[in-house]
């Protein structure tokens, strides 16, 4: 529903501004430019989708090997001590615990197709424990925030888009996304714990979150000792080594479980081809809408307005061109993806704006969509502090993404 409103708004606002420019300013080129943008954008959307097929098939094939090799189960076991403290209202040994672990682990690995059904199952089980069936319980809200904060270990789709858009090193945003998504998730956990009066000084929570903060601080400090060129080389090298380790690790996990690794890869790769074809109409719709919006001058007005405000406050405005992606992300994943592609098309995949838009895309998730799907599936009407916690986590992710982008690419 939100995406419907956004799609309609792109055209209505573009038409109104185009009419104003024609009638008041005498700009006879605005409507031809808007119509040309529809043809160019639809062509671009198809070409991007076509180019995605190979790389998407590769990574979904690798992910299928990991899934069949039990990597999700391993992550679930690692997370279990911490999650027991984050969900104190869930009885020990309840089946919902397994569903929550599996959902979060699948999200961390970027297995969206597996994560959503597991998430809906977990929400149904949480509803069974909920004394007020129309009101979100504390475990429901914590579970939702962990989903909306978008903790991701392998941002496959973003790297795939960067490769297709001609980035020299599609993986150079890997480390920045890991750092930004860590901050959004940490903020979401802390804020939700404060709302729910959960003891953050519990030994397990304190050691885990504190230890992660120390590791992230050490990474940031280490990169801070390097100049920009060294930072880019080290970041890209580490990212590629980590990704190769993940690929080999998934294959070894599959072999250990006696999985037919080749067949598992082919099964996942087929899903990649299907996914690439399935996204064509969605990408056409959103890129055409954005193209018309930009051709009318509306996007420039939005960006220039924010830029003026930032300049008035004495701030650097390099990040402003990527803000449409950040603003769209809580509302629509497809819309944000379109904004990211538009930013890379307009400014370049290796520009500061192009990279930052990718980090925005990877640092958080679609808060309102997840809230509507998960809570709607069990008939929740009163969301309590879920929206506030989710949006504050998004804000933390956006601010972290900006700071980290200036550090790595500024």
For every predicted segment, state its role.
Residues 7-11, 16, 27, 40, ...:
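Aromatic-residue detector
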Residues 60, 94-96, 136-139, 240, ...:
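Sparse, context-dependent recognition of short Cys/His-centered cofactor- or disulfide-binding micro-motifs
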Residues 101, 105, 140, 231-234, ...:
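Generic signal for short, ordered secondary-structure residues
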Residues 29-128, 257-346:
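Membrane-embedded alpha-helical segments and adjacent helix-loop junctions characteristic
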Residues 1-54, 160-293, 311-313, 385-410:
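Signature of multi-pass transmembrane helix bundles
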